[in-house]
A protein has these predicted regions:
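Active-site pocket-lining/capping segments in soluble small-molecule metabolic enzymes
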Residues: 8-162, 170-330
């Protein structure tokens, strides 16, 4: 299977970039808090005649034993039933949904978890997927829910292409560690071996390139979820990175020196270069960010990169309310 995509075509809206008009698919995190942003962007692009762009979202309800990474977005009053209805609402709007079950340490003894199985059953629809960190869980889902797309989580941080070739029969899509974003020859080889539609690249990883605790951090979060140690989980997800890296920032003499600390966030030009290479699937993380930052990242990587910022402003502020103002004027 491959990532859902919308066939490309000529855009009726003019763009200011020479970027190839090839299809691109965006897997956008923070689905619980980002509903308005993603659905509005999809609707606007469609009405403006901008073809070739499709969306999937990902997130997970809190308190899931199979969870890993940092997808747990607690929303006041949310239950697993309301989360499942959110998935259904995205699907109704033509946006597929990836559940996040990326725990790295799932074993056979954990597969009977009622809460996680309930979520798999309730969200089981064509086009939806599961982001997985355990091969044991991946085989379990493949056997019992064969229509789910299986997305291999980047939390393993495997940089050797052979690892992905060895597991090509189990997963539909591989989310690659951000280190590989800069290795064009490796990406080209993987495109030739696996196909571009099976590779997904994260564009806005804010983790520092030289971070020495990255893997340990993800391992501990997986263990906290598996052991229902929610006090540890809160400690690992609330200001953990800020505390771990505080010393390097206190050593900076001026705010402008922040630019010297490199992370893995890509520029618009780097995204264009990856598209030229053949990459068509991109991941936009939105973990633990306010709605304002969520919108900024979507604007930067999608709307502004396509040269549509002014068009979208006019669309939102003039075209959409036109009937209302015309009615008041009459």
């Amino acid at each position: 299977m491959s990532q859902e995509s919308v066939p490309g075509g000529q855009r009726s809206a003019q763009t200011s970039t020479d970027e190839p008009k090839s299809p691109e698919h965006w897997n956008i995190g923070g689905a619980i808090n980002g509903f308005q942003h993603v659905t509005s962007a999809k609707s606007a692009l469609e009405q403006l005649g901008v073809g070739g762009i499709s969306f999937t979202v990902y997130d997970q309800h809190f308190g899931m034993k199979w969870a890993g990474g940092r997808p747990h977005s607690f929303a006041a009053g949310q239950t697993k039933e309301t989360f499942a209805r959110l998935v259904q609402e995205y699907n109704r709007r033509g946006i597929t949904f990836n559940l996040v079950f990326s725990n790295l340490f799932i074993e056979e003894k954990h597969l009977g978890d009622k809460r996680c199985n309930w979520m798999l059953e309730r969200c089981y629809r064509e086009g939806n997927g599961v982001i997985v960190g355990s091969h044991v869980l991946a085989r379990y889902i493949r056997d019992r829910f064969p229509d789910y797309r299986l997305i291999h989580s980047l939390t393993h941080f495997h940089k050797d292409p052979q690892y992905y070739y060895d597991h090509a029969d189990l997963y539909d899509v591989f989310v690659l560690p951000p280190h590989l974003n800069y290795r064009a020859k490796v990406l080209q080889e993987m495109i030739e071996r696996l196909g571009a539609e099976r590779l997904e690249l994260l564009v806005n990883e804010t983790c520092f390139r030289e971070c020495s605790i990255r893997q340990d951090h993800y391992d501990l979060i997986s263990k906290a979820c598996l052991e229902d140690d929610w006090d540890l989980w809160e400690d690992l997800t609330s200001g953990f990175c800020q505390r771990a890296h505080a010393d390097r920032f206190t050593r900076l003499e001026e705010p402008k020196d922040v630019k010297r600390i490199k992370n893995f966030t890509l520029s618009q030009d780097e995204v264009r270069d990856l598209k030229t290479l053949g990459i068509c699937n991109f991941k936009l993380a939105n973990r633990q960010v306010p709605a304002q930052q969520y919108a900024k990242w979507m604007d930067y990587y999608i709307i502004d990169r396509l040269g549509l910022s002014t068009t979208m402003y006019v669309y939102d502020n003039y075209y959409r309310p036109a009937a209302h103002f015309a009615g008041r004027a009459s």
